């Protein structure tokens, strides 16, 4: 670890795929409480800008921090990627503090699209922020557009909170020129922020929250000490369904269960977690997980690898102390309990955006202060991989699981999805057959539309057959190529339970690079949040799908795009009753 005079921390990580990865602690959307919710997320969207033909890049805003990364591709170099990312924050050697109203307006529209996307596909309910005075969704809404001047002032104010002590930088390689460049830019920031937030959010403990969830989860408040952080790292590397959350200066260990009986035993104090010592902790974490640790605990004064001897040599005492603290929090009701609930009728409170939820007090009724049993935890394996064809009965359940667990990777190709994970076969089956997970997986049917229409365009099956068998196997096979005949009609209007645009496009020079560039152009215009595309077996032919509330504008953009010499697009209007009748007459797919 290299520490600049203003406390910027720089790490060399030659194993990461990114060229540069930057995080800003104490800079997430928890800072929006008592201001306009969404300022942090809007700032993230305003800052990131790059040439998608030369770079891969992304950014994210969480409760307590913001992070950005950039990777060079094609003819660009690592140095180009570093300078590109730094340019998001600095202009002419000074920290950016000017945002045009037109750009703010476009990105607010994009935020509304992101809200729509996330609520169609996920359950984006942030319990901790809600209990701390925020909303269940804190990513920004379209009504921000009514206060553009106030929003711009808040954005400038937020930029002035950035300080050297907040900055963490990972680089793949660090030469003298790069280090000097960092000193001239992030190293020029003040060591302490010029503007300090007026309040640090504090959540309310002793609550039971009934909300959609794939698991029965208990958030246990523990002290944010070094030993407890090392204990969390130990548990995370060894077991599944254990993680942590932070808000303000508070730390919670999150423990999830698939068995309601075990969950209730843990809550009543009659059972403790069965934590056993493993052979060795290697700290072989992803760069995302490492960055999150440094940002959530900015007071860490050493490289995490400096603690590898301590976490292994002192693991017994660390885990005993952590186990005792967990049990004390259970007894004292320093917990937040999440109980899976999928009823739209049950509600006893709402946030300012009128999202309904049930919040109850966690009482001491039935509490047992002497545990007499232990609960086994799911152990991690080194690696596992499965391939699932489109239309397989387990497809959507596996996608749901990958979306709910950050350590599951999913890659899509023309025939199906390849999933990498570290579960045993028995554990993954137990999860996917559990009552709460099955309800959660089926509670957001919108994600299915992407695969329904991919099946329609790529398999040659009729829309009636696909809809009649949407939960069973629809074979994709390389043995037969679907010859797609593009007719005169380029638009087919349907009614579904989500608003989206999808279809197939063909172009002589069409490739993934041009489609990524197109996606970013649509994002800059505020018309979409993201666009998925799959390369079909027919030459230069792609399937596109995007959730959007601006369906006509997106259709017009795609319909007039000169990269496509043939297209067949489906435009869905949201409604209570599905109607795909327009697809039965004119769309011809010859196998």
From Swiss-Prot:
Alphabetical list of SUPFAM superfamilies matching this protein: LuxS/MPP-like metallohydrolase (SSF63411)
Cofactor: binding comment: Binds 1 zinc ion.
Cofactor(s) needed for function: Zn(2+)
Main subcellular localisation: virion
Family: Belongs to the peptidase M44 family.
Inducing factors: Expressed in the late phase of the viral replicative cycle.
Highest taxon of the lineage: Viruses
Active-site residues (renumbered): 44
EC number: 3.4.24.-
Phenotype when changing residue 41 to A: Complete loss of processing activity
Binding annotation for Zn(2+): 41, 45, 112
Cellular-component GO terms for this entry: virion component
InterPro entries recorded: Metalloenz_LuxS/M16 (IPR011249), Peptidase_M44 (IPR005072)
Species in which this protein is naturally found: Vaccinia virus (strain Western Reserve)
Keywords on record: Hydrolase, Late protein, Metal-binding, Metalloprotease, Protease, Virion, Zinc
Presence of the UniProt keyword ATP-binding in the record: no
Cell compartments where the protein resides: Virion
A GO term, aspect molecular function: zinc ion binding
PTM: Undergoes proteolytic processing during the course of infection. May be cleaved into 46 kDa and 22 kDa products (Potential).
Result of changing residue 120 to A: No effect on processing activity
Stated name of the protein: Metalloendopeptidase OPG085
Record's keyword annotation contains Zinc: yes
A GO BP entry: viral life cycle
């Amino acid at each position: 670890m290299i520490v600049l005079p203003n406390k910027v921390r720089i790490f060399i990580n030659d194993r990461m795929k990114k060229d540069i990865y930057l995080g800003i602690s104490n800079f997430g959307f928890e800072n929006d409480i008592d201001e306009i919710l969404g300022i942090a997320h809007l700032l993230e969207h305003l800052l990131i800008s790059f040439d998608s033909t030369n770079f891969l890049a992304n950014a994210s805003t969480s409760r307590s921090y913001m992070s950005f990364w950039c990777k060079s591709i094609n003819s660009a170099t690592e140095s180009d990627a570093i300078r590109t990312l730094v340019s998001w924050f600095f202009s002419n050697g000074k920290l950016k503090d000017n945002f045009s109203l037109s750009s703010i307006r476009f990105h607010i529209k994009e935020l509304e699209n992101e809200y729509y996307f996330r609520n169609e596909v996920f359950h984006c309910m942030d319990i901790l922020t809600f209990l701390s005075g925020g909303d269940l969704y804190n990513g920004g809404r379209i009504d921000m557009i009514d206060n553009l001047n106030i929003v711009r002032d808040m954005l400038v104010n937020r930029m002035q909170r950035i300080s050297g002590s907040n900055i963490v930088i990972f680089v793949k390689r660090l030469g003298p020129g790069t280090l000097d460049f960092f000193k001239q830019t992030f190293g020029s920031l003040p060591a302490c922020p010029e503007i300090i937030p007026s309040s640090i959010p504090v959540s309310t403990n002793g609550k039971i929250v009934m909300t959609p969830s794939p698991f029965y989860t208990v958030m246990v408040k523990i002290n944010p000490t070094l030993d407890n952080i090392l204990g969390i790292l130990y548990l995370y590397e060894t077991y599944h369904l254990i993680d942590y959350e932070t808000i303000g200066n508070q730390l919670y260990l999150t423990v999830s269960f698939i068995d309601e009986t075990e969950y209730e035993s843990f809550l009543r104090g009659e059972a403790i977690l069965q934590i056993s010592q493993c052979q060795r902790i290697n700290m072989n974490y992803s760069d995302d997980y490492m960055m999150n640790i440094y940002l959530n605990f900015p007071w860490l004064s050493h490289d995490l690898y400096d603690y590898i001897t301590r976490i292994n040599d002192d693991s017994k005492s660390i885990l005993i102390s952590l186990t005792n603290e967990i049990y004390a929090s259970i007894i004292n009701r320093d917990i937040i309990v999440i109980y899976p609930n999928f009823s739209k009728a049950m509600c006893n409170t709402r946030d300012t955006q009128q999202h309904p939820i049930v919040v109850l007090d966690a009482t001491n009724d039935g509490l047992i202060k002497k545990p007499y049993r232990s609960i086994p935890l799911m152990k991690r394996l080194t690696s596992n991989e499965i391939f699932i064809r489109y239309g397989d009965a387990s497809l959507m359940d596996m996608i749901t699981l990958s979306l709910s667990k950050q350590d599951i990777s999913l890659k899509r190709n023309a025939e199906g999805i390849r999933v990498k994970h570290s579960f045993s076969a028995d554990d993954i089956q137990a999860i996917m057959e559990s009552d709460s997970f099955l309800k959660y997986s089926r509670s957001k049917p919108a994600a299915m539309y992407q695969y329904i229409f991919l099946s329609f365009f790529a398999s040659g099956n009729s829309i009636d057959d696909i809809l009649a068998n949407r939960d069973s196997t629809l074979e994709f096979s390389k043995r037969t190529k679907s010859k797609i005949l593009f007719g005169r009609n380029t638009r087919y209007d349907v009614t579904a339970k989500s608003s989206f645009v999808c279809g197939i496009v063909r172009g002589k020079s069409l490739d993934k690079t041009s489609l990524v560039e197109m996606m970013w152009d649509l994002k800059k215009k505020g018309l979409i949040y993201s666009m998925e595309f799959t390369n079909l077996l027919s030459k230069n032919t792609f399937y596109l799908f995007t959730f959007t509330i601006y369906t006509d504008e997106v259709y017009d953009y795609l319909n007039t795009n000169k990269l496509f010499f043939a297209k067949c697009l489906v435009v869905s209007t949201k409604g209570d009753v599905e109607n795909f009748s327009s697809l039965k007459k004119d769309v011809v797919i010859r196998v």
